[in-house]
From Swiss-Prot:
Protein name: Lumican
Pfam families in alphabetical order: LRR_4, LRR_8, LRRNT
Record bears the keyword Transmembrane helix: no
Natural source organism: Bos taurus
Disulphide-bonded residues: 299-332
Name of encoding gene: LUM
Keywords for this protein: Disulfide bond, Extracellular matrix, Glycoprotein, Leucine-rich repeat, Phosphoprotein, Proteoglycan, Repeat, Secreted, Signal, Sulfation
InterPro entries cross-referenced by the UniProt entry: Leu-rich_rpt, Leu-rich_rpt_4, Leu-rich_rpt_typical-subtyp, LRR_dom_sf, LRRNT, SLRP
GO CC, any one term: extracellular space
Subcellular location: Secreted, Extracellular space, Extracellular matrix
Residues modified to Phosphoserine: 308
Sequence ranges of the LRR repeats: 71-92, 95-118, 121-141, 142-163, 164-185, 189-209, 210-231, 234-254, 259-280, 281-300, 309-330
Segments forming domain LRRNT: 32-70
Quaternary structure annotation from Swiss-Prot or TrEMBL: Binds to laminin.
Amino acid sequence: MNLGVFPLLLALIGGASSTYPDYYEYYDFPQALYGRSSPNCAPECNCPESYPSAMYCDELKLKSVPMVPPGIKYLYLRNNQIDHIDDKAFENVTDLQWLILDHNLLENSKIKGKVFSKLKQLKKLHINYNNLTESVGPLPKSLVDLQLTNNKISKLGSFDGLVNLTFIHLQHNQLKEDAVSAALKGLKSLEYLDLSFNQMTKLPSGLPVSLLTLYLDNNKISNIPDEYFKRFSALQYLRLSHNELADSGVPGNSFNVSSLLELDLSYNKLKSIPTVNENLENYYLEVNELEKFDVKSFCKILGPLSYSKIKHLRLDGNHITQTSLPPDMYECLRVANEITVN
């Protein structure tokens, strides 16, 4: 166990110790293999002969979607000036699987008709860093991964029927809890949901119980309903850092979820350590107002087979010091690799 005193280096804290799963590990991205282009390609774009089903049209100052020839399955249109999508933009490529439109000028009113729902094989749709004010749709049932980050979204349309939708990225928007609650109820395959950097003051109701990863950091959440997380029987990774959580808004067993492996409550207003299940492995509580270390927050009882599985614990930026830690902490946290205190 490495128990030490660390200065509060904010630039270093922002994720240095985190073991959150890398979202991009879930996908094997086709890489941009620029070189000689396939003849079956839009003249302004690049379709590598070694990867003829991919068309790269990044950073070309395009104002509209170019002609997309049949056979293209992976289409990259990043960092352009595209401000509209016509209804027939993809009629030659109904087997398109990935459509990447990040860093353009798209608005909802200029995305015509059922341009996306016609793509019956589409699995990945990214429209990050655009000018959307609501989610796009209708969308095809084949969709697995939807990314709409860094827009101005305050309204979510219906996601009904999207039985394969597994990943949703909605961070850095203008969403409030009611907009989220109404939209996501029926997504039975959803495992990954990022709602960080929005405008929520409460936890949204009706989130799918299938979630494995839920990010709600950087909102204005101050209260957790009693047993809110109990129904998420598969939840493993939960972020609630940079909110307004205080002891009065956190019921005693809020985070006592047996499936939970990682919990981030850093940068809140907590004075006592919320109780967690013995299975939790990584717990981030830095920069709160914690006054003492209570072993019972980690171990209800102590014994040869009764101990916490905590590996990494962050307590720096609180009122807890190394000398104030109780002796039985070491027995409770016997498998910890790192405990960071002031």
